[in-house]
């Protein structure tokens, strides 16, 4: 074989090898893009799941419907702004689907309502600034208004792990509290005897 033919053959082989290398590099780059994309999606899913858990920790665990029974010693309000049977609008969001819901007042009581923070007895996440626990739902509270920072034992069972939990008083408010029936604006679920909503959290329908 002449030197010229041998040279051309080598050059042709070299060009073919370069094409193969470029093709392989392209496949490698494409695979890398897919891997990185999959990792990103997986992380997003994990973050989304965590966020959903955080959002639901204080809402979804709340017992939506409750008993019409009230704590011993709780006094009915003699002249509430919203009488039993009144149709009202809820302007607070203790639970998802609550704000903006139409409700019916099923009870009205004069008491002291507290915002509390506590760690559930069932090992759940700490609940900060829960609204509301009333005077009659706190162990040995008597008639004396409790002060921010006071440590108390809860006797309410609005949420799982609440009853028997040690809590800290965040704030106190003498007010009329209401028990209401309403239909969730998000799920359509009928919630009966929700405890509690304060007078400031309601408006006339």
UniProtKB/Swiss-Prot annotation:
Coiled coil: none annotated. Residues 1-40 form the signal peptide. The keyword Isomerase does not apply. Residues 47-66 have a biased composition (Basic and acidic residues). It comes from the Bacteria. The keyword Magnesium does not apply. Gene3D superfamilies: Domain of unknown function DUF1541. Residues 44-82 are annotated as: Disordered. InterPro entries: DUF1541 (IPR011438). Keywords: Signal. This is Uncharacterized protein YdhK. It comes from Bacillus subtilis (strain 168).
């Amino acid at each position: 074989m002449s030197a010229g033919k041998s040279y051309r053959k080598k050059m042709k082989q070299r060009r073919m090898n370069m094409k193969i290398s470029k093709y392989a590099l392209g496949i490698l780059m494409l695979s890398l893009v897919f891997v990185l994309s999959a990792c990103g999606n997986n992380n997003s899913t994990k973050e989304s799941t965590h966020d959903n858990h955080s959002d639901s920790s204080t809402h979804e665990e709340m017992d939506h419907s409750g008993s019409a029974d009230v704590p011993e010693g709780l006094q009915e309000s003699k002249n509430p702004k919203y009488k039993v049977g009144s149709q009202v609008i809820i302007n607070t969001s203790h639970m998802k689907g609550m704000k903006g819901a139409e409700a019916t007042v099923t009870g009205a009581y004069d008491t002291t309502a507290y915002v509390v923070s506590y760690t559930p007895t069932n090992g759940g996440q700490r609940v900060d600034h829960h609204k509301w626990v009333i005077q009659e739902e706190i162990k040995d509270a008597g008639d004396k208004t409790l002060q921010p920072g006071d440590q108390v034992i809860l006797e309410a069972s609005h949420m799982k792990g609440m009853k028997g939990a040690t809590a800290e008083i965040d704030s106190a408010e003498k007010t009329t509290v209401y028990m209401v029936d309403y239909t969730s604006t998000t799920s359509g679920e009928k919630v009966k005897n929700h405890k509690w909503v304060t007078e400031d959290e309601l408006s006339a329908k």
